[in-house]
Structures are given as structure tokens and as C-alpha cells.
Design a protein with these regions (language model features):
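N-terminal export signals
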Residues: 5-27
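Core dinuclear metal-dependent hydrolase active-site scaffold
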Residues: 29-99, 169-240, 316-319
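Active-site environment of divalent metal-dependent phosphoester hydrolases
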Residues: 62-63, 84-86, 109-115, 141-144, ...
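Active-site metal-binding motif and surrounding structural segment of the metallo-beta-lactamase
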Residues: 74, 84-136, 234-252, 264-269
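Extracytoplasmic/secreted proteins, especially bacterial periplasmic and envelope-associated proteins
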Residues: 89, 115-119, 157, 230, ...
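Metal-dependent catalytic neighborhoods of phosphoester/phosphodiester hydrolases
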Residues: 115-124, 145-152, 257-260
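Binuclear metal-ion centers of metallo-dependent hydrolases, dominated by the metallo-beta-lactamase
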Residues: 133, 141-202, 267, 272-319
Length: 319
């Protein structure tokens, strides 16, 4: 979703987000807006023999999600990947770590999540990358044509490139566990619900509860309020409770406070650029000038007692 569309969507659900105390916005790192991208920061979050979690900020100023799990023996599992403009950087990173991706998960059919993979698929022999399988559950094309016609052509192009690639494609099922060994597993928690027509593509995000050497991580994609509420109603609490939570929809206008209260995370990962963190309209009008709800979410995390927050205005390596 482009920033202009993101702004339009945010304006439909709220006017201006209220300010919260500075403690709510405290994150492990906040580089100055406009500075050059600093080197990746590292932090110990899991410990022991855990897979490393590489969280990549976008190579543009737009919203995106790009996540890599890397095992002690060098195995790779990807989630999303970002925009097409992120593809070249991501390809280089994956090749730096051996160039063999066991599984590539895509959470939903928005370009800031799947387009980087699409660009890699266009390259001869995928730019030297080997991909074992792609796991996705996108909404049906005829449904996308009804609820988000501006997305249709982009999704069709990507699915066409994926079909031509010859890669193995799997559709996740609720309760399916993907066990990668070395202490890493992904459990699928939900499926698309065609009754959700408001914010339909975001609400189709497939969420995974990841176990990494005994630590639990909830991957939320861009899950919206409706799907988040359904998961709270229908899932046992132990399926949602997680040590670490990816903030849904880049930290605003996604899942609600009740969802995060059910998750009860100790640490949060914000796939949120600086302008969105600051609620800065167009990234140039100053903090608090935008229609975004980020500050509400910051307040919720403060009230829920979250201990650590990682802001993706830079790359992070969590081990």
C-alpha cells in the first residue's frame, strides 16, 4: 500500500491521534529523521541456540515488512520482503547467507509485503537464489476486484510470475505446524474470512505463532480489528499469548487493544518508518500533524507493561 493510500485509509478511521507520554514512545533505537541508514543494531532477545531474527527496514521511506529467520546452521526462512525497491537489497542479503531459502511465507496481498519477492522471481534463475516453497493464502481475485480494485492488477501480475516460476506453492491451513528443526516452528492461526469486506485485504493477513528455541513470537502481518477480534473470540488464549509481537498494520489502525491484551507481549517489533512513528503527515509537517493512530498504540503498550520495543527505522538482528 503506497503512502498516499495509507494516509487516505488512516483518515477514514480517525482524525488526529492523541499524544501520549514519552515513555510510551520509548524504543530501543530512534535515529534522527533524515539521517543516513545506520548499520544494523543487535540485541539479545531469545538467547541460547535460537535462530537469529533479521528485521529489515524498507529501502524507501514507505511502509513495508521484511523478516528473515536464520538458523545456527545457516538455514533460512523468510516472511514477506517489502516493496520491489527492496528486492535487490534483500536478494543480496539472502545470498550473503547462502542463497537457499527453505520457505517463504507471505502474509497477505499488499505490495509492501510481496513485491520484493515478485522482483526476485523476474530475474533469471531468481538471481541465483534457491527457494524451496512459497506459502500464501491470498484472497480470490474476483473478491479482490470487488473490495480493492486498485490492488487487482498488481496481485494478478505477481501470481502470474509465481505460477511461471515453477516454485512449489502451498496454502496454509489453520493449525498446520511448519517444523524447521533447530527449535523453530510456525503454526498457522487463521484463514481468510470473506465476510470481512471492510479493510478486507489487511484482514486476510495470515498470522503465525512462531516458536524459536522456547520463545514465542506472534507474526500479525496487517491484521485488522475485525480479524483480530475473531481470533480473540475463537482461539484459546495460549495460542495468542506470545513473548514477542509484531505490531499489526505497522503499528496503527490494525488490531485493537483487546487483541494485544490477549497476546500480552513482553517485547514488540514495530515495522514502522519514522514518519509514521511520529504521526507526521507526509513526513515533512512535524510530529502530530498526521491522521495516524500510532500514538494510541504506543499508549496501549505502555498500559500493558511491554518491556522492550524495537522500532524499524533501522535494521535489527535479534538473537
Amino acid at each position: 500500500m503506497k503512502r498516499r493510500d495509507f494516509i487516505k485509509a488512516a483518515a477514514c478511521v480517525a482524525a488526529f491521534a492523541s499524544r501520549c507520554g514519552s515513555a510510551a514512545g520509548a524504543a530501543d533505537e530512534r535515529p534522527l529523521r533524515g539521517s543516513t541508514l545506520p548499520p544494523a543494531a543487535e540485541a539479545v532477545l531469545f538467547g541460547g541456540s535460537a535462530w537469529k531474527l533479521h528485521m529489515y527496514t524498507g529501502r524507501t521511506t514507505d511502509i513495508s515488512l521484511s523478516t528473515l529467520f536464520r538458523s545456527p546452521s545457516g538455514r533460512l526462512v523468510m516472511i514477506d520482503g517489502g516493496w520491489g525497491a527492496d528486492g535487490e537489497f534483500l536478494l543480496g542479503e539472502l545470498k550473503r547467507f547462502g542463497g537457499v531459502v527453505d520457505t517463504w511465507f507471505l502474509t497477505h496481498a499488499h505490495r509492501d509485503h510481496y513485491r520484493a519477492l515478485g522482483e526476485i522471481l523476474k530475474k533469471p534463475r531468481f538471481g541465483g537464489l534457491k527457494i524451496g516453497r512459497v506459502v500464501l493464502d491470498f484472497l480470490p481475485l474476483d473478491f479482490i476486484a470487488e473490495v480493492s480494485p486498485s490492488s487487482l492488477q498488481h496481485v494478478k501480475e505477481f501470481l502470474g510470475d509465481l505460477a511461471k516460476s515453477g516454485l512449489k506453492v502451498e496454502r496454509p491451513a489453520v493449525g498446520r505446524v511448519y517444523d524447521f528443526g533447530e527449535g523453530l516452528s510456525f503454526e498457522c492461526l487463521n484463514s481468510c474470512d470473506l465476510s470481512m469486506r471492510r479493510d478486507a485485504i489487511n484482514n486476510s493477513s495470515i498470522c503465525y505463532r512462531v516458536m524459536n528455541a522456547g520463545s514465542s513470537i506472534l507474526v500479525t502481518g496487517d491484521v485488522g480489528e475485525e480479524m483480530g477480534a475473531k481470533m480473540v473470540r475463537e482461539l484459546p488464549r495460549e495460542k495468542l499469548k506470545s513473548d514477542v509481537c509484531f505490531m499489526a498494520h505497522h503499528g496503527q489502525a490494525g488490531a485493537n487493544k483487546e487483541f494485544y491484551a490477549a497476546v500480552r507481549p513482553e517485547a514488540c517489533i514495530w515495522p514502522t518508518p519514522q514518519w509514521l512513528w511520529d504521526n507526521d503527515l507526509a513526513g515533512e509537517n512535524g510530529p502530530g500533524s498526521g491522521p495516524f493512530l500510532t500514538n494510541y498504540t504506543k499508549c496501549w503498550m505502555q498500559e500493558l507493561g511491554v518491556k522492550r520495543q524495537f522500532l524499524l527505522t533501522r535494521d535489527w538482528v535479534l538473537s
